[in-house]
């Protein structure tokens, strides 16, 4: 019994110590935000804006998928003091033109004021050992260039370190990056954002909402410059 209490006590102490450490590290980043999709449920954006400066809303994936809550989330976010960005998830298996058409049809002019996020991750046979990846890289570059030209906005690439190094940087060496599954710490340019918890939980009105937690990798002044790329 005594041993059990000691183990439980140490566990609680360890958790609280880690929480304090994490909060201290987060305090070094002045700009905080979240990523959301239809799995996040109904969010109060006014409440969200009290502790966050930006929100990225999932819009499309590939050439056919649209997030069910995109329009509703985008519309309601406009009434809050929070900067808004939109997300397209890159598909290796569909053409650039089809993906661009689907994105255009889904979002219209609802692209927010932040750089558009293009999320990239390996799946199935699409990885560094695939001989077709050079062509896939050109497809990604075509999509990024078209988005920048069409919407006159910046584009930030969201991917983990492996995908950024092997796939993204060879074709887009100067593109703004969003480190997926990252850790709070120092990242050199062009990493602009750091996702430190992809499976976060946000408590609102007694409900637990699924979101991704991210910080901007820079100062308030740098954030102002980044957030005005339109």
Give the positions of each predicted feature.
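Hydrophobic faces of well-ordered beta-strands that scaffold small-molecule active sites
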Residues: 32-36, 53-57, 82-88, 116-118, ...
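Catalytic domains of cell-wall/extracellular-matrix polysaccharide-remodeling enzymes
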Residues: 117-188
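Hydrophobic membrane-insertion alpha-helices, especially the h-region
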Residues: 1-16
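Functionally critical loop-and-helix segments that line ligand-binding/catalytic clefts
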Residues: 23, 28-33, 41, 172-230
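Hydrophobic alpha-helical transmembrane segments in integral membrane proteins
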Residues: 18-22
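Substrate-binding cleft of extracellular glycoside hydrolase catalytic domains
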Residues: 26-30, 36-42, 58-142, 148-150
């Amino acid at each position: 019994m005594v041993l059990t209490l000691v183990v439980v006590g140490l566990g609680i102490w360890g958790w609280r110590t880690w929480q304090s450490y994490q909060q201290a590290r987060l305090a070094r980043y002045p700009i905080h935000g979240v990523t959301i999709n239809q799995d996040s449920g109904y969010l109060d954006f006014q409440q969200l804006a009290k502790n966050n400066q930006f929100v990225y809303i999932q819009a499309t994936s590939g050439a056919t998928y649209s997030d069910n809550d995109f329009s509703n989330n985008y519309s309601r976010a406009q009434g809050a003091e929070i900067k808004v960005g939109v997300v397209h998830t890159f598909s290796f298996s569909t053409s650039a033109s089809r993906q661009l058409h689907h994105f255009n049809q889904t979002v219209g002019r609802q692209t927010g004021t932040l750089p558009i996020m293009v999320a990239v991750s390996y799946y199935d046979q699409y990885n560094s050992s695939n001989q077709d990846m050079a062509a896939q890289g050109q497809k990604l570059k075509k999509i990024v260039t078209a988005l920048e030209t069409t919407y006159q906005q910046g584009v930030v690439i969201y991917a983990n370190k492996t995908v950024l190094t092997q796939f993204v940087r060879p074709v887009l060496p100067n593109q703004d990056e969003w480190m997926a599954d990252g850790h709070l710490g120092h990242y050199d340019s062009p990493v602009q954002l750091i996702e430190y918890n992809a499976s976060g939980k946000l408590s609102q009105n007694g409900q637990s909402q699924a979101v991704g937690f991210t910080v901007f990798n820079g100062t308030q002044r740098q954030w102002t410059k980044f957030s005005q790329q339109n």
